[in-house]
Structures are given as C-alpha cells and as structure tokens.
Amino acid sequence: MKFGIVVNTNRPRAIAAGKELISWMRKEQIDFVLDANSAENLKESPSVEMENMHEQADFFVSLGGDGTLLGVSHFSNTKPIIGINLGRLGFLAEFCEHEMYDVIKRVLQNNFMLENRTQLEVSVSGKGQVRNFTGLNDVVIEKGTYPGVPVISVSIDNNLVSEYRADGVIIATSTGSTGYSLSAGGPIIIPKSKVFVVTPVCPHMLTVRPMVICDDKEIEVRVETPGDRFVLNCDGMLIQNISPSHQIRVRKAKNTVNLIANERRNYYNVLRQKFHWGKEQES
C-alpha cells in the first residue's frame, strides 16, 4: 500500500507536519511518494508529477486546508483522500494534526469509512473547442474585469430559468454549499444531499434568490453580454476566459471524490463550532 503525500508548501506548519510524517513513515517502513512540488520544497524523495500520482498511490494524504484538498481532488481519480487540516475552517479536511498517524494506521489495517462526495462535470464549448473538467465544490461564471453588470442566462434541462443581471452565478454541490455560495447568500446543505444550488452573485434584481435543484438536472449557462473579459473558475481555480460564444453545461459527474471520514466528527457539531453558533459575542 502506497500513500501519495501532497503538502501546502505555502504553510510552514504544513511543511513541518510533512517532514514529520515522512520521517515516521520511513521509520514504520510505509511506502509513500510526494508530488513534485512538495518534494522540491521539502527536499525529499521519491516524487512524481501531480497528474500522474494516482497511478502510483493507493491513498492520498492532503496536508493543508480545504483548498489543498480541493486541489488534490482534481487529480485523485477516485483514490481515497485523507484530509489533514492545517488551515482555518476544515470542512473537508476532517482530521487534526494529532490524528494524522492514527488514521494512517487504521487505513493500513483496512479499518476506515469512506464518504463519497458528488462532483460537478462541466463542459465548455465554443470557438471550435470543447473542454471538460470536474469540480468538488463549485463552478463559477463571473464578470472578471468587466466594469458593468453582465447578463447571465441559466437554463435547467433546456428550460430557461432566468437571465440574471448579476456579478456572477455559482453552481455548487452540497459539499460546496458552505463555500463561496454561502458567502453569496446561499443555503447550507448537508453533504450527502442529492442536490445542487444555483446562487447568483450580487444580483441587481431584488426578488432573486438561490435555487436548490435535484442533482439529476443539467444546467446550461451563457453570458449574454458582449465581451471577452468574463471568467469561469472551478473550486477557486481559473479555468478560462469566456464570452457569449461559449456554452457551459453542468451536470453530475459519474465519479465521486472519496474522502476518508472521521467517525469521531458530527457534521452538526462541525457547523456549530466553525460558525460559532450559540455563542455569545464578547464585547
């Protein structure tokens, strides 16, 4: 059994944890490989390019925050991910640093629970090209550097829902509902719910609200305003610039992202702790 280790090299704490983990794995004779960037920054080996890591690793270990785990999910190719939270919120990265060794031991003993998270599959066609990619949290179509308020049309199963006059539109999974969508006024959705949420960003339309839909629907998005400064990003990573000539289709992906679950965690406790629900504000 081999573990693929990915470290957020922008966090000194993650680098330190990565070095400790590698030292422990060598001592325990546990097979591992690092992605090339982590290996270079930690001055460790062996390494492999990130896009090829799934060919060597049976499990991924993500050392960082939720953003690090999101990046890993794009390359895991259904291989299970152990998320070690060394960031801030830690919705996706379920394990604390002090739980790192215990969860790896349990994986080695085949004593673990998997949580399958739905992904978005996104198809962008235009200018004679078609690009396909996936996202665990969300896909966002936004104004980019366009100075005005663009019009973005959204259709569901070929039925027009609205032409939003807004800074952008977020399409989020239940997993991604506590990310950008929440900041834009969207609802919190329990991760295993079989739904997507369509959330407009700063709509110049007083009656517009986020919409929750079944995840068996196909969503089509188009920018109706002329220009080429609009952007499409996925899980916080820029994918490409878009224009009215592009057609964007979003649906449920065939493959899930598979996370090693922390059986000691309760999602409602996590919400209460992370968002400080029920706590009085100190003066």
Curated annotation (Swiss-Prot):
This is NAD kinase. The active site is at residue 66. Keywords: ATP-binding, Cytoplasm, Kinase, NAD, NADP, Nucleotide-binding, Transferase. Belongs to the NAD kinase family. One of its GO terms (molecular function) is metal ion binding. SUPFAM superfamilies: NAD kinase/diacylglycerol kinase-like. It is found in: Cytoplasm. Involved in the regulation of the intracellular balance of NAD and NADP, and is a key enzyme in the biosynthesis of NADP. Catalyzes specifically the phosphorylation on 2'-hydroxyl of the adenosine moiety of NAD to yield NADP. Its main location: cytoplasm. Its cofactor is a divalent metal cation. Gene3D superfamilies: Probable inorganic polyphosphate/atp-NAD kinase, domain 1, Probable inorganic polyphosphate/atp-NAD kinase, domain 2. PANTHER family: NAD KINASE (PTHR20275:SF0). NAD(+) binds at residues 66-67, 137-138, 165, 167, 178-183.
